[in-house]
């Protein structure tokens, strides 16, 4: 997927990584997380399309079956993302705070990791604003009758 994204020559690149990295079996490679993120950024910066690159903080996760650890997200991953965004002078989109107190059925599906329609809408509104600099238009539910 990473190679295909480069070949696509994007105008905008949204990097939202880290949630699955917080699992114990993945976070044992935590020393590589920052350098891998920086590699992705520098690789996209070399694209002929000169894309706008946006880094996103991880969304919160609550008790879940997958081993995703919110304390790793808040104490380690999100600070790394913030530092890397600052180092490369990139926009950092905070997706954590808008969902921090909504890790329940209002914004998440039953597993407390994946977003439902409401949570996805919040995420989309914040990313839209990061790309355009404007407030997202009121979106209509395509499945509503």
What are these regions (language model features)?
Residues 30-34, 38, 56, 85, ...:
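Generic alpha-helical hydrophobic packing signal
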Residues 16-20, 43-76:
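Active-site segments of SGNH/GDSL-like serine hydrolases
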Residues 11-17, 52-57, 91-94, 114:
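Structural recognition of the beta-strand scaffold that forms the well-ordered cores
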